[in-house]
């Protein structure tokens, strides 16, 4: 049985979260994406403390597909440094 992992990311826009989730499922890179939110995030960025509403995305996949999933997220994610 393959090792199953969960990948978590946050995104500032529900439609973008759904677009990424849909692409990952369509490309058969993941079994499931769950999107919840909005959540409130407080974080340090470029020397300051920021706050933002975000959408929480839980991604379920095989460990062997992690690099492909990460690459797709990086290509489609709006953040300079996707979490």
Where are these regions (language model features)?
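Positively charged, small/polar-rich N-terminal and surface patches that mediate targeting and assembly
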Residues: 1-83
């Amino acid at each position: 049985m393959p090792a199953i992992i969960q990948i978590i990311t946050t995104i500032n826009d529900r439609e973008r979260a759904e677009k990424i989730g849909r692409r990952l499922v369509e490309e058969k890179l993941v079994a499931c994406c769950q999107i919840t939110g909005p959540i409130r995030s407080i974080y340090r960025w470029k020397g300051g403390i920021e706050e933002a509403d975000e959408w929480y995305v839980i991604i379920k996949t095989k460990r062997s597909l992690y690099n492909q999933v990460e690459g797709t997220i990086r290509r489609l994610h709006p953040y300079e440094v996707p979490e």
